[in-house]
Amino acid sequence: MDFLTMCMLAAGFGMAIGAFGTGIGQGLAVKSAVEGVSRNPGASGKILTTMMIGLAMIESLAIYVLVVCLIILFANPYKDVAIKLAETVAK
């Protein structure tokens, strides 16, 4: 496999794993918040505020994964080295 194909696969798998993890984390957070509100409806405002802050923290992981994947795809610092290496091997 050439370098660009490996970069695309790495970015795809990285985003898939990151999205899977954040989806599971957000689902568990919402489940716990709903259970907490059903047990104590009087504390729903405090629970929902804490849940929203937690969801923002969890979602930031997906944003960081997206940024790293975009760097791998479009601003890879090793791209020039890999292309030169491939050219010398091809000769």
Curated annotation (Swiss-Prot):
| Molecular-function annotations in GO | lipid binding; proton-transporting ATP synthase activity, rotational mechanism
**Superkingdom field:** Bacteria
Location(s) in or outside the cell: Cell inner membrane
**Where does the secretion signal sit in this chain?**
none
Topology in the lipid bilayer: Multi-pass membrane protein
| Record key words, sorted | ATP synthesis, Cell inner membrane, Cell membrane, CF(0), Hydrogen ion transport, Ion transport, Lipid-binding, Membrane, Transmembrane, Transmembrane helix, Transport
Location, primary (coarse class): membrane
Query: InterPro entries annotated for this entry?
Result: ATP_synth_csu_bac/chlpt, ATP_synth_F0_csu, ATP_synth_F0_csu_DDCD_BS, ATPase_proteolipid_c-like_dom, F/V-ATP_Csub_sf
> Where exactly is the site Reversibly protonated during proton transport?
E59
Q: Write one Pfam family the protein is assigned to.
A: ATP-synt_C
PANTHER family xrefs? ATP SYNTHASE LIPID-BINDING PROTEIN, MITOCHONDRIAL, ATPASE PROTEIN 9
**Function of this protein?**
F(1)F(0) ATP synthase produces ATP from ADP in the presence of a proton or sodium gradient. F-type ATPases consist of two structural domains, F(1) containing the extramembraneous catalytic core and F(0) containing the membrane proton channel, linked together by a central stalk and a peripheral stalk. During catalysis, ATP synthesis in the catalytic domain of F(1) is coupled via a rotary mechanism of the central stalk subunits to proton translocation. Key component of the F(0) channel; it plays a direct role in translocation across the membrane. A homomeric c-ring of between 10-14 subunits forms the central stalk rotor element with the F(1) delta and epsilon subunits.
Spell out the family assignment given in the record's similarity comment: Belongs to the ATPase C chain family.
Q: What is this protein called?
A: ATP synthase subunit c
Question: Lineage of this protein's species?
Answer: Bacteria, Pseudomonadati, Thermodesulfobacteriota, Desulfuromonadia, Geobacterales
